[in-house]
Amino acid sequence: MSVWRAKCEWWLALAALVLLPSLASALTTQSLDSGWQFRLAPSDPHAKTHPRAAQWLPATVPGSAQTALMALKLVPDPYWRTNEPAIQWVGLSNWQYRTHFDVDAVTLARGHVDLVFDGLDTFADVYLNGHKILSADNMFRRWRVPVKSLLHAGANTLEVRLYSPIGRVLSWLLKQPYALPGEFDSPFGDEPRGKQTANYVRKAAYQYGWDWGPRIVTVGIWQDVKLESWDALRLKDFSIAQPVVTADIAKLQAQLELDSDVAGTARVALRWRAPDGSSRTMDHDITLKPGDNAVAIPFEIARPQRWWPVGYGQPNLYDFHVDVTIAGNALAGADRETGLRSIELRRQKDKWGKSFEFVVNGVPIFAKGANVIPMDMFPTRVTPARLARLLESARDANMNMLRIWGGGYYLPDDFYATADRLGLMVWQEFMFGGAIPPANQAFRDNVRVEAIQQVMRLRDHPSIVLWCGNNEVETGWESWDDRKAFKQSITPAQRAQIEQGMRELFDRTLRDVVAKYAPDVPYWPSSPGTDYEGAVNVTDNGDYHYWNVWSGDALQATAYLDVTPRFMTEYGLQSLPAMATIDAFTEPKDRSIDSPVMRAHQKYDRGAHYDESRGNQRLLKYVEREFGKPKGFAALVYLSQAMQAEGIQLAAEHLRASRPESMGSLYWQLDDVWPGITWSGIDWYGRWKMLQYHARRFYAPLLIAALRNKGVTTVSLVSDGTTALPVRWRVRVMDFAGKVLSEHTADATLAPLSGTQVARFTDAQLLDGADPRKSFAVFDLLDGDKMVSRNLVFFDAPKNLALPVPHVDAQLMQEKNGCALTLSSHTLAREVWVSFGDLDARLSDNAIDILPGQHVTVTVHGNASLAALRKALKVQDLATVMAGAPR
C-alpha cells in the first residue's frame, strides 16, 4: 500500500508540473532598493523646526534617516568638531519611507510572492498598497510576508513608518516600577538619568553612546528589500553540517529546509569542488510533503583538505552546490562555501584551575588578536572593501582571532567570508553589550527568532569558533557598583525574576539555538564567564576582562605582569589617533588636549555633558608617568601611541610566555567607530597606530619575551610552531652609544606550541655596575644567523633615562614593488616613527627601535609617487619628541 501511495504522489506531482508549466520555475528575486523617498512623519513635533525634512525627499536604501539627511546637507557631519548634538533630533523623530514599484504578470502568476526585509531599524509598520502587513520590532531579524493577494499588476506602493526607538520605549518605561540597569546615560537629556531605553530594544546598543563613540540612534531601512516569487518549491536554507572531521575522514550532512506545495519524490543533486580543484557529484532522492520539509543527507569525504587558522596550515575551503529537481525540472538551487574543521573549547582541570583553550583539528591554538567594534556609527557606510582591509590588517599583524563584541550588530556575510579565506578565527557574540535584559518571555521569544536566523545565516563559516551569549552582563550584575545598588533597591522577588530571566536567556534559549543549529561550534554564555561554575571574571577559570590598568585603579602597565588568567578577552590602553586623522575633524584652534572638540571626541569617563569627559586627563596621567610632560600637542599624539603600544606589548608577551596556563590574548580594541580618542590600534581612517605595528612583532610566531618586573627580567621563548626548532638566544647589555658591556649566548630547543622560561636576571646581574640611566639590554632569538625576534629592556621609565637625541638618517628609494626606506642611527633611536601625512602609504614595519649603527630597511606600499613621499616624509623618535627638539 505504501509503495502504491508513493507512486500516486509522484504522478500527481509530475501531473502538476505538466499542467502548470510555471511550477517548473525556480525562485526569482526583484530588488526593491531603488526609488525610495522619506520624510518626517507629519505629526512629529520636529516637523515644525525642520520643515524641509517634513517634505518627501530622496533616500538611499539600505540606509538611515541620518545618512539621507547628511547627503542632503540637512544635518551636519556629526564627526566634525562638536556637531554630535545637532543630529540628536533625528533619532528622536518618527519617519516615513515610501517607494513605488511595478509588478509584471509573470510575477503575479507565480504561486507565491513574498515581501522580504533583510533589516528594519527598528520599530516599523509596513503598508503595501494601503494595507498594513507587518509590525517589526527587532533590528537583527529578517522579515518575510506573503503579499501576492495585495499586489497589483503594474504600479504598487510600499510604505514604511518608522518610530523613534527612544520615544517608543521611554513613555512606557517611565511608568514601570523600576528601570533595568543599562550602560551609558544620554548626555543630551533625551532620557532621564538611570532611565535607559536601550535594554528593552533589539537594536545595536553602541548607537546609544559608548565610552569610545558618540550617541547617534539611527532609524531607517538598513538592509535590502526585495520581492521573492516561486511556485512549487522554495529552498529556505542549505548548509553543510560537520559531525565528524578528522585527518582521515569528514562525515558530513547536507542539510536542506524546503517549503513545498507538492507531495512526492524530489531529487537532490549535491556536488562539491575541493580546494585542490577535484570535484564530485552525488544524487539523493527525498520524499516531500506539502509544507515545511527538513532534509539531512549524509555523505563522506576521505582525507579532507581541512581548514586551518592562519599560521597552522592553509584555510582550505570547499565549494558546495545543491540542485533540487522534480521530474527533471530544476526548482531550487544554492551554493555554499565552507571549510572542514573540528572545533573544541577545551576546559580541563589542571594545576592552575581549569583550562580555556581552543583546539582546532586537534591542535591547541593560542588565540592572538583583538576585539572588533562596529566600524561606523552608520552600518551601511561600511563597505566590503573596508571590512576586508580591517581583516587583512589583523592578519598582517599576526593575529589569528577576532572577538566580535556584543554591543554592535551581526556583521555582513562579506566579513565572515573574508575571515574564512584569511584563516582568522572569530569569537562571535550575540548582541548583548552589558545592559540587563528584560525577563519576560516575549522578549526571549523575539531574541530566539533573531538567534535562529543569525546562526543559520552564519553557520557555514569555518572562521566562527565560538558563539558567546553576551558581553559583561553576568560580571556586571555580579560586581558593578550601579548593579549592586539596583539590587538593593528592588524586592527579593523582583531580583529573582530578573536573575531567572537572564539564566533562561543565556543558559537555555541561546545555548539551545546553537546546539540545534550549529552543534559543531561551542557555546559560552557570557564574557567574562565560567559557564555558571561560580564567580565570573576570575583568573583560574573561564575568560577574563582586566581593567585595573587604565580604568579602575589606573595601575601602571607593569601590573599586567602580575595577572595570568586562563584567557584574556579584554584589556587595553588609550591613545590619540594620527595627526592626519585629528586634522580631519578639527580646526587648528581645536588641537589641544583640553579643547572642547578634543573632549567631545573622548568618551571615556564622560560627565553630564557630551564634551565634559575626564578621559583625556587619564590619558595624560599615563603618558606623563612614562615620558614626562609632553612638549606640545603633536608630541602628545606620538607619546600616547608609544605608551599604548609598549603597555599592551607587556601584557600580550606575558600572556604568550605563560602558555599553557594562559591560552588567549585579545586586547581592546582593533578598530574605531569614529575619529576619536580610544583604545584602538587602527583609527577610523584605517591608519595604523604604533600598537598595530608592535602587535605584528609581539604576535609573531616565534618570540623572545623579556619581561622586567620589580627589578627582575624573566626571559621566555615562545613558539606557535608545531615542530621543535633548535635556536640560540642572546642577551647583550649596551650603552646608548652602542658599546657592548656584556654578552651571553645560549643554545635552546624551542618546543612546539609552547612558552618556556629560559632565564631570570636581576638588574644587578645584567648591569654588573653599569649606569642604569645610560644602559639597556638587548634580547635576541636567533635561528642560525637570522634574528627572528628582539626585545629591549630598560631599567627605568624613559623620562628618567639619559636618552641621547639621535640623528636618524632616512633614505627613500624606488624599487620594483614599491619604495624602500632605509633608516639608521649612530646612537640608540627608540620608537622610530615614519609618517607621510595624509598620503596613502603603509609601511612593512614602523615604531622601530634602531640599535647604534644598525640599518633597518622597510617597504612603503601605496599609490603616492616617490617625489610625493619624499616631500611628505617625517621621521620621529622618542628622545627627540620628549626633548621637544625640532626635526
Model regions and ranges:
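Substrate-binding/catalytic cleft of secreted carbohydrate-active enzymes
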Residues: M401-R421, M425-Q602, M643, G647, ...
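Accessory beta-strand-rich segments of carbohydrate-active enzymes
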Residues: L32, R39-S43, I87, L92-R234, ...
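Short glycine/proline/serine/threonine-rich loop/turn segments at secondary-structure transition edges
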Residues: L108-G111, L151-A155, A302-D319, Q765-S775, ...
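Active-site-adjacent substrate/metal-binding segments within catalytic domains
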Residues: M70-V103, L108-F117, D121-L128, L134-D137, ...
